């Protein structure tokens, strides 16, 4: 007799292998036909708002793993919020203006951009940006991100530009925006100012110099002995800035010494705290301290410049420290913010002896026309020959580089537009207190950056950007930005785009009949600079979120760690400055960088990069999503083929668990779940463990801890289900009667587990969970079209076992662990084959073990151990039994011998009361109900 056909060995249409690269595109098509994003909004319309505002990626290249990590996390946030009952609008955005696109278009098309009409050049930039919006959008769609792809916001869109102009106007009206000559980061390779967020620091080798500035005028304060052969010794790492020196700064309260070099009679002024170090660097071994004075004593003395015909003034500054150098600080107002402020305080004129191209001007004398880096060795040689070089050293220091061209930059004073952050720093810091920061240290980082930052340079000497909406009166020369001009420019930009600024003359752009508010003049010029790209992206909360989406503030901002000084900060500053509100986000979350498998930065030159498109083709987008969902994204996230291979193995465990459930639910109707009172205790144990999973995952989703969700689901699949529950219930599912209460109990639990597990993992494993959902039987209240259109399962409180009952079950599983160890020994000794061939006898040697055996009396131990018989009351182990002590219970003795009775040919369990066909009573009853004909 072939009994296989009498077993409940059903098969679903769910394949064991995912075949994700082939299957996912079909699912994307299904989602598109379903219009999943809008269906999701309809489903939760009128419910509490969860608004993730998309930090715009720059539209200048294909997708990289940083993009993938960022968009995966955002999609996890949106999907999980939707499935927890929130209304979740999600508008993707792109940042379009800026130097990287200009540079790329010039290089790609070999353009002479300076000879091109500006509107024509800007149109080429626009097309370039739009191309990469399309490229990136397709990549994000392939990743499975649910968003309003039909209506993204773009900072180059006329509607956006029209609103950004209003942000500028509001800040100008409040007096927060001004034009001034101040030192800013300057890339002379690209000939533009840079913001702090556009700076990258790299370790560069350099020559540091200690330079002697001979005393010129002591203001009658020094004795004859003190001023004899006296020089003020400064230290600098930027030799090329020395032509711009106007002053030497001392700390007013620190002690300074005049030191005589007994070898050559020269005298030097240095800080006493640094004297020994300076003398050692200069090779001066025999020296004498002539006198001591506080720094304030030397104020307004004059020193001769070491190689130019001019003097340098001794000034005081609190920022002069005793950490390094000489205590006498080289001060060039055209090349440093502190230098600028100090010289301004002393009424000195601004001197900027370097032009836009990074070349010295005529002010630098013989060095005129030289690039700054070319002048370094020439100046060094001249100082050596003139005897003004005290010492020099070779060091490696951290130096700022342009984020785009990767070349060193300079600090240089130029006429620029600034946002006076000082005016509202306190308000910006106070706004941080109302934000939930993840990680929690984010608030301290943001506040420190705001407090320490200088005024924000918002102008750029570029063409591809939003024009600064300021006019100049030709009669009085004053800048003009009024409510009337802002309204007119906003209207024009909204209708025609910002190219109109470059296509029309100023007189055509101002309001009709407009006159200068300062002098009544009627003729105007336009500002030629464009706005910093960070002003663009910093305006998205107003230009896109508030205007187009109708909400403010956002629930959450999520971006990389670098955005504390980038988008997070620019958004905060424009919100506080322009709108007079708090932060534009209630929560601020950061993620780390993506790095290679060894933790190194990924670079094309190193060949260690990972292309998301390759991951999609080889493994599927769900594996990429699982990578993002399995990582502690607050720190750097490693990425390599080996990691994806391992994740694929973890993925198969989840998929195989789902397949097991689906295969055993093909004949099950979840509208008729077994009632709690009728459900088998083991099944209720599994549901109680499921409840624990659901509670843990709900808390994790609230805190955006997706790693916790992934690990919890994986542990539940591997430990709770595969290793225990699913293995134990196979007999009931396959061998009990199809409609028996015991089998329906197991199926009910299986359905509850699969339903809840699929929903709880759906935000992360979007494609696979939806594939499972489409295969599952559903209740009447479920939406069968897509798993994300359903709410996450709440814990099944009515099915939960009591704490005492759960303790008893945990005891049973600890006993099972000890029994399994002895079964393995018996199998290795060939005493038994399958575990169903075993009879297990348990013996307690101490009170704890006796109590454990007493606690599990009500539990069906043969079912739990997957053996034919279990006894706890035998006097001694059977002769020939394999006997071992327990591990979980050292007072336990486990004896394994051959099972008593006859092996049932249908279920393979041994029975002492078989029927005439050798069937155990259970199988005999099932076969009878099936009207099995025995030949």
Residue ranges and their predicted role:
Residues 215, 346-358, 462-464, 486-636:
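Alpha-helical recognition segments enriched in aromatics with Gly/Pro capping
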Residues 2-20, 26, 30-34, 106-243, ...:
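Residue patterns forming the tRNA-binding/recognition surfaces of aminoacyl-tRNA synthetases
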Residues 247, 254-328, 337, 341:
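Protease-associated
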Residues 44, 48-55, 66-69, 73, ...:
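Secondary-structure capping and boundary motifs in well-ordered enzyme cores
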Residues 95, 184, 188, 194-200, ...:
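Acidic, turn-prone loop/beta-hairpin segments
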Residues 42-103, 234-241, 315-342, 346, ...:
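N-terminal catalytic cores of NTP/NDP-binding nucleotidyl/phosphoryl-transfer enzymes
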Residues 191, 461, 477, 520, ...:
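Cys/His-coordinated zinc-binding microdomains
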Residues 187, 402, 473, 516-519, ...:
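Short cysteine-rich clusters marking metal-coordination/redox-active sites
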């Amino acid at each position: 007799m072939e009994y296989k056909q009498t077993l409940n060995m059903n098969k679903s249409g769910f394949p064991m292998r995912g075949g994700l690269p082939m299957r996912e595109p079909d699912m994307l098509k299904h989602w598109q036909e379903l219009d999943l994003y809008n269906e999701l909004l309809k489903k939760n319309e009128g419910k509490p708002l969860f608004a993730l505002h998309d930090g715009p990626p720059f539209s200048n290249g294909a997708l990289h793993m940083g993009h993938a990590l960022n968009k995966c996390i955002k999609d996890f946030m949106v999907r999980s919020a939707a499935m927890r009952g929130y209304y979740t609008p999600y508008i993707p955005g792109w940042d379009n203006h800026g130097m990287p696109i200009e540079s790329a278009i010039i290089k790609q098309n070999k353009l002479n951009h300076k000879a091109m009409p500006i509107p024509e050049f800007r149109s080429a930039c626009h097309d370039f940006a739009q191309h990469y919006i399309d490229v990136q959008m397709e990549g994000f769609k392939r990743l499975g991100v649910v968003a309003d792809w039909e209506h993204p916001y773009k900072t180059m869109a006329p509607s956006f530009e029209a609103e950004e102009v209003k942000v500028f106007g509001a800040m100008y009206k409040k007096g927060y925006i001004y034009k001034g000559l101040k030192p800013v980061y300057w890339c002379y390779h690209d000939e533009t100012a840079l913001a702090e967020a556009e700076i990258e620091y790299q370790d560069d080798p350099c020559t540091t110099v200690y330079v002697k500035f001979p005393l010129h005028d002591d203001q009658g304060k020094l004795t004859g002995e003190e001023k004899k052969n006296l020089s003020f010794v400064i230290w600098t790492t930027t030799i090329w800035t020395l032509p711009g020196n106007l002053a030497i700064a001392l700390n007013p309260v620190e002690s300074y010494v005049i030191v005589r070099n007994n070898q050559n009679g020269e005298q030097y002024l240095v800080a006493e705290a640094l004297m020994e170090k300076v003398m050692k660097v200069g090779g001066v071994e025999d020296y004498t301290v002539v006198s001591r004075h506080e720094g304030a004593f030397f104020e307004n003395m004059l020193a001769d410049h070491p190689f130019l015909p001019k003097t340098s003034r001794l000034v005081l500054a609190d920022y002069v420290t005793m950490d390094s150098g000489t205590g006498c600080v080289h001060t060039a107002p055209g090349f440093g913010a502190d230098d600028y402020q100090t010289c301004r305080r002393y009424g000195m004129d601004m001197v900027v002896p370097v032009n836009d191209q990074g070349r010295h001007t005529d002010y630098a004398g013989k060095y005129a026309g030289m690039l700054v880096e070319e002048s370094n060795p020439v100046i060094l040689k001249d100082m050596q020959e003139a005897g003004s070089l005290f010492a020099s050293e070779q060091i490696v220091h951290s130096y700022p580089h342009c984020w785009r061209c990767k070349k060193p930059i300079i600090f240089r004073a130029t006429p620029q537009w600034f946002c006076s952050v000082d005016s509202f720093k306190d308000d910006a810091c106070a706004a941080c207190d109302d934000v939930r920061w993840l990680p929690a240290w984010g608030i301290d980082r943001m506040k420190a950056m705001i407090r320490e930052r200088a005024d924000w340079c918002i102008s750029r000497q570029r063409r591809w950007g939003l024009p600064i909406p300021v006019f100049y009166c030709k009669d009085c020369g004053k800048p003009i930005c009024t409510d009337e001009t802002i309204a007119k420019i906003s209207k024009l930009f909204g209708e025609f785009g910002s190219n109109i600024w470059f296509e029309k003359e100023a007189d055509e752009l101002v309001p009709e009949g407009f006159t200068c508010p300062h002098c009544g003049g009627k003729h105007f010029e336009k500002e030629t600079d464009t706005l910093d790209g960070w002003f663009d992206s910093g305006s998205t909360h107003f230009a896109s979120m508030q205007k187009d989406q109708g909400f403010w503030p956002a629930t959450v901002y999520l971006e990389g760690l670098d955005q504390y000084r980038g988008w997070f900060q620019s958004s905060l500053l424009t919100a506080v400055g322009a709108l007079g509100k708090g932060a534009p986000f209630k929560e601020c979350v950061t993620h780390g960088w993506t790095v290679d498998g060894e933790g190194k930065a990924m670079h094309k030159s190193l060949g260690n990069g990972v292309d998301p498109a390759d991951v999609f083709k080889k493994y599927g987008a769900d594996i990429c999503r699982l990578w993002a969902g399995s990582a502690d994204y607050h720190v750097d996230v490693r990425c390599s083929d080996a990691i994806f291979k391992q994740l694929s193995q973890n993925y198969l465990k989840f998929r195989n668990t789902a397949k097991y459930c689906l295969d055993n639910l093909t004949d099950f109707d979840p509208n008729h779940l077994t009632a709690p009172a009728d459900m088998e205790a083991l099944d209720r144990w599994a549901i109680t463990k499921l409840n624990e999973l659901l509670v843990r995952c709900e808390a994790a989703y609230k805190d955006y801890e997706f790693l916790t969700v992934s690990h919890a689901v994986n542990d539940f699949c591997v430990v709770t289900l595969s290793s225990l529950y699913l293995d134990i219930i196979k007999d009931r599912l396959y061998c009990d009667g199809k409609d028996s209460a015991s089998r329906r109990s197991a199926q009910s639990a299986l359905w509850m587990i699969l339903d809840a597990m699929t929903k709880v993992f759906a935000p992360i494993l979007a494609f696979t969970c939806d594939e499972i959902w489409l295969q599952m039987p559903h209740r009447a209240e479920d939406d069968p079209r897509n798993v994300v259109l359903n709410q996450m399962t709440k814990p099944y409180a009515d099915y939960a076992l009591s704490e005492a009952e759960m303790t008893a079950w945990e005891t049973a599983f600890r006993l099972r662990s000890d029994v399994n160890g002895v079964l393995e020994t018996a199998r290795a000794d060939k005493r038994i084959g399958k575990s169903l061939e075993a009879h297990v006898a348990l013996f307690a040697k101490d009170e704890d073990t006796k109590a454990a055996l007493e606690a599990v009396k009500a539990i069906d131990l043969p079912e739990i151990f997957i053996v034919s018989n279990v006894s706890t009351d035998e006097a001694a182990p059977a002769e020939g039994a394999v006997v071992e002590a327990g591990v979980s219970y050292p007072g336990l003795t486990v004896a394994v011998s051959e099972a008593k009775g006859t092996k049932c040919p249908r279920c393979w369990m041994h029975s002492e009361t078989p029927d005439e066909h050798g069937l155990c009573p259970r199988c005999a009853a099932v076969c009878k109900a099936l009207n099995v004909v025995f030949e």
